[in-house]
Amino acid sequence: GKYIMPYFLADFLKLHPDVELILDVTNKSKVIKSLERNEVDFSLVSILPETLTVNRIELMPNRLFLVSNSATEFPEKIYDKNILENIPIILREMGSGTRQSMEQFMLLNNLNVKKKLELTSNEAVKQAVIAGLGCSIMPIIGIKNEITTGNLQIIPVRGLPIQSTWNLIWHKNKNFSPIAKAYLAFLEEYKQDIIKSKFDWTNSI
């Protein structure tokens, strides 16, 4: 989420320079608890909560690819899904939306994956992959620079990328402040322009 939300906030904050904002980057399970306790106005998730009734705005697609460091050779043009059973896999922690997406994919495809390492942020996972500790399935939105510079490579696998959607959600019974209502109106008007200007590159991968 930290790779996305700043771009959906920047122009809004220019229009409302007096607004003070707190942006907390955490995993999905903690995000849902914050909504339940009415501690936040909005949350950004790629998997909708099952235990909480929310409203939402779909922001943009979320695609997760299998990646490794560039020093590891993967010469085939495309691999079968069972490659995931033969390489060390680095996972996010329990409660992470990325972790949940990976586990759903593995369960759906009856894959017995060897967990090499578990880390608590996408940045930590990314650095571990670059260091050669294993491979991981990661959101493309967070690895643009590493793909461009050659520190990471995408391993083409049948059935990947995993497809989901980034949703801005809020509690169904949330009573919004005027500025929160203004932000929703801003998103409805400018969402597509932001996606086109800031994230169009994801369509070329």
Question: Can you say where each PLM-predicted feature lies in the sequence?
Answer:
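A late-sequence structural motif
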Residues: 3-4, 153-197, 204
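Short beta-strand->loop
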Residues: 55-65, 149-162
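Short secondary-structure boundary segments
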Residues: 47-48, 70, 140-142, 159, ...
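Secondary-structure junction motif
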Residues: 74-75, 88-109, 176-180, 184-185, ...
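Ligand-binding cleft/hinge of the Venus flytrap
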Residues: 8-16, 99-112
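Flexible hinge/capping segments at coil-to-helix
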Residues: 51-94
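Hydrophobic hinge/microswitch elements
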Residues: 27-32, 36-40, 45-46, 103-154
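Central regulatory/effector-binding core of bacterial HTH transcription factors
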Residues: 1-52, 119, 205
